[in-house]
Amino acid sequence: MATPLSPFSWLAIGIVKLYQWFISPLIGPRCRFTPTCSTYAIEALRAHGFIKGCWLSTKRLLKCHPLNEGGFDPVPPVQKQDRDK
C-alpha cells in the first residue's frame, strides 16, 4: 500500500498543477526533458515525499537550460529509507 502524501506535498503538487493549467499554456513548450519538468516535479513529490521531491525538482529545474541537451530523465526509484514519513 502506498504511503499517504503529506499536506505539504499536496500543496506543492497543487502549485505545480496551477502552473501547468494557467502559465504553461501561455509560454508554450520549453522543457528539454521527458517527462517535462512540471510532470517530473509531481512524480518526484508523489514518489519521494515533500523534502526529497522538492530537492529532486530543484535539481531538475537547474538542469533545464539551453546549454543542456535534455532527453529522457525519469524520477529515480524510491529507496525504502528515502520516503518521508
UniProtKB/Swiss-Prot annotation:
Transmembrane segments: none annotated. It is a peripheral membrane protein. One of its GO terms (cellular component) is plasma membrane. It is found in: Cell inner membrane. Its main location: membrane. Pfam families: YidD. SMART domains: Haemolytic (SM01234). InterPro entries: Membr_insert_effic_factor_YidD. Keywords: Cell inner membrane, Cell membrane, Membrane. Could be involved in insertion of integral membrane proteins into the membrane. Belongs to the UPF0161 family. This is Putative membrane protein insertion efficiency factor.
